[in-house]
C-alpha cells in the first residue's frame, strides 16, 4: 500500500528502523543532515536501505541555499532567490543558469542512488522568513519561468519535480514548523498570485509531485491546505488537473497539530487527498501509526513510485562529466557573486 514516508535517527539503520522499513505501509524514506557525514557514508547508508527495501523511494530536502542537507562532497547549490540577481536581471541568462543548477542538484543526488529532492519551492517571496530566498522571486511570472527551467534541468538528469508549498506559503510570517500560520488574504489574492506557478507548471506537465502547505486560508477554507479536500481535491485535482503524487508536509510540524494526534493527522491528510504522508523526527509517532492506524484497504491512486527516476536518462546524464563540471563552476560563480554583495 505504501502510504507512509519516515526518517532515520542517525548515520545507519538500526534493527528497530529496519523493522519499520519492512512494514508494507512504508513506501518512502526522507534523509536529513543527521544522516550524513560524508558522501562515502551516504552511499553506504543508501545501499543498506536498499538491501532492506530495494524499491523504497528515498528523498531529501536539497533545494540549495540554506536548505541543503548534504554539503561535504557535494556542490553548494545557490539559493534560488540569488539566481536572477546574479544574472543582473537578465531572464535569458537566469533561465539557463536555473536549468544547469537543477541538473547539478539532481545528478549529484542520483549518483548516490537518492531518488528525489523535494524541490523546487514555488512560493512567492513575500513576508515569510521561512521561505525568503528559497523562492525564485516575488513575481509569479519570474517564479514560473525560472522554476520551469530548473525542473527541466532536473528532468535532464532523470529526476521528477515536487512543487511546494501549495497554494503558497510566502504571505504568512509564521513558520509552520513551530506555529500555525494563517493567511488572512481574500481568495482573489491567492488565486491571482500565489497559485499561478502551480497552475502553469501543472498545465505544462512539469510537476510529478506537490506538497501542500500547513497554512490556513480562512477566507477560502477553514482547514490547513494539507488537510483540506477543497484545496487538494477540488482545486488541485479537479480544477488544475494535477495527476501526480500529493505528499503531506511533515505531520510532526506545529502547523499539523490542529488535526490532533498522529492518528488524527494521518486520517485528515489521507481524507483530504494526500497520497503519501510524512512523519519526521518522531519515532514514537511513526510507531503509533504503524501499530494503531487503520490504513486504506486499497493502494494510493497516485503511488509515490511515480517519482522514481528515469533510469535511462540518469545513465546518460552520469556520463556527461563536462556538463556536471561546468554546472559546479556556475554554482561557485553565483555563490561568489552573492558573497561579494554582502
From Swiss-Prot:
<feature type="binding site">
    <location>
        <begin position="164"/>
        <end position="165"/>
    </location>
    <ligand>
        <name>substrate</name>
    </ligand>
</feature>
<keyword id="KW-0133">Cell shape</keyword>
<keyword id="KW-0573">Peptidoglycan synthesis</keyword>
<dbReference type="InterPro" id="IPR019800">
    <property type="entry name" value="Glyco_hydro_3_AS"/>
</dbReference>
<dbReference type="GO" id="GO:0051301">
    <property type="term" value="P:cell division"/>
</dbReference>
<protein>
    <recommendedName>
        <fullName>Beta-hexosaminidase</fullName>
        <ecNumber>3.2.1.52</ecNumber>
    </recommendedName>
</protein>
<dbReference type="InterPro" id="IPR001764">
    <property type="entry name" value="Glyco_hydro_3_N"/>
</dbReference>
<keyword id="KW-0961">Cell wall biogenesis/degradation</keyword>
<dbReference type="Pfam" id="PF00933">
    <property type="entry name" value="Glyco_hydro_3"/>
</dbReference>
<dbReference type="GO" id="GO:0005975">
    <property type="term" value="P:carbohydrate metabolic process"/>
</dbReference>
<dbReference type="InterPro" id="IPR017853">
    <property type="entry name" value="Glycoside_hydrolase_SF"/>
</dbReference>
<feature type="active site" description="Nucleophile">
    <location>
        <position position="249"/>
    </location>
</feature>
<feature type="binding site">
    <location>
        <position position="69"/>
    </location>
    <ligand>
        <name>substrate</name>
    </ligand>
</feature>
<dbReference type="InterPro" id="IPR036962">
    <property type="entry name" value="Glyco_hydro_3_N_sf"/>
</dbReference>
<keyword id="KW-0963">Cytoplasm</keyword>
<dbReference type="GO" id="GO:0005737">
    <property type="term" value="C:cytoplasm"/>
</dbReference>
<keyword id="KW-0378">Hydrolase</keyword>
<feature type="site" description="Important for catalytic activity">
    <location>
        <position position="175"/>
    </location>
</feature>
<keyword id="KW-0131">Cell cycle</keyword>
<dbReference type="GO" id="GO:0008360">
    <property type="term" value="P:regulation of cell shape"/>
</dbReference>
<dbReference type="InterPro" id="IPR022956">
    <property type="entry name" value="Beta_hexosaminidase_bac"/>
</dbReference>
<keyword id="KW-0132">Cell division</keyword>
<dbReference type="GO" id="GO:0004563">
    <property type="term" value="F:beta-N-acetylhexosaminidase activity"/>
</dbReference>
<dbReference type="GO" id="GO:0009252">
    <property type="term" value="P:peptidoglycan biosynthetic process"/>
</dbReference>
<comment type="function">
    <text>Plays a role in peptidoglycan recycling by cleaving the terminal beta-1,4-linked N-acetylglucosamine (GlcNAc) from peptide-linked peptidoglycan fragments, giving rise to free GlcNAc, anhydro-N-acetylmuramic acid and anhydro-N-acetylmuramic acid-linked peptides.</text>
</comment>
<dbReference type="GO" id="GO:0071555">
    <property type="term" value="P:cell wall organization"/>
</dbReference>
<keyword id="KW-0326">Glycosidase</keyword>
<dbReference type="InterPro" id="IPR050226">
    <property type="entry name" value="NagZ_Beta-hexosaminidase"/>
</dbReference>
<feature type="binding site">
    <location>
        <position position="61"/>
    </location>
    <ligand>
        <name>substrate</name>
    </ligand>
</feature>
<feature type="binding site">
    <location>
        <position position="134"/>
    </location>
    <ligand>
        <name>substrate</name>
    </ligand>
</feature>
<comment type="pathway">
    <text>Cell wall biogenesis; peptidoglycan recycling.</text>
</comment>
<comment type="similarity">
    <text>Belongs to the glycosyl hydrolase 3 family. NagZ subfamily.</text>
</comment>
<dbReference type="GO" id="GO:0009254">
    <property type="term" value="P:peptidoglycan turnover"/>
</dbReference>
<feature type="active site" description="Proton donor/acceptor">
    <location>
        <position position="177"/>
    </location>
</feature>
